[in-house]
Amino acid sequence: MEKLLPKAKQAEFHRLKLAKKQQLTKNTFALEFEIPEALKLNYKFEAGQYVTVKYPSKGVVFQNDFSMTSAPYEEKISLGIKINNDASSTQDLFDNIDVGDEVDVSEPKGRFTLVSKPHEFRTIIGFAGGIGITPLISHFKNILHTEPRTRLFMFYGNRKSEEIAFKNEIL
């Protein structure tokens, strides 16, 4: 008989203030949200998780999932976001959100996580393309911070060199 997974609990949203907004390439940008002291426990996360952001675009409220690039020890929520085209809702998000604005952000979720093994010697290889690099940045930052014996290798592809998001962080 199949073992059924428990139903996921409904995501809880909280208003978070945008602390930083940065255009990375023509088609990607990063957002960084402050976590108020009262919500620190709600936003405790593991590297590799994601959040859902609610934002208005063209008269409709969108909900999109974005992987975090921040590591747990940083105590902030940083996201990498791709703009698919000029008419996309993510283009509106970039154009219309400013530092200091508040946005509904879900508590972290997702199971693309790793068990930390700080006392072991191990090698981890990551593969990513385009904006798919975001959860790996979170993982690699966390591993570099907590696992001194772990070796990291990354294979990362993009169509064009000018489309490399987070170039400074990964070089």
State where each predicted segment sits:
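Ferredoxin-reductase
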Residues: 2-102, 106, 122, 150, ...
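Gly/Ser/Thr-rich loops at beta-strand to alpha-helix junctions
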Residues: 48, 130-134
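Histidine-anchored nucleotide/phosphate-binding helix
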Residues: 68, 133-145
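A short, basic/flexible loop-to-alpha-helix module at the beginning of a structural domain
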Residues: 107-120
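Conserved S-adenosyl-L-methionine
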Residues: 120-121, 142-152
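Conserved beta-strand elements of the Class I
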Residues: 125-127
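Short, aromatic/basic amphipathic alpha-helical patches
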Residues: 165-171
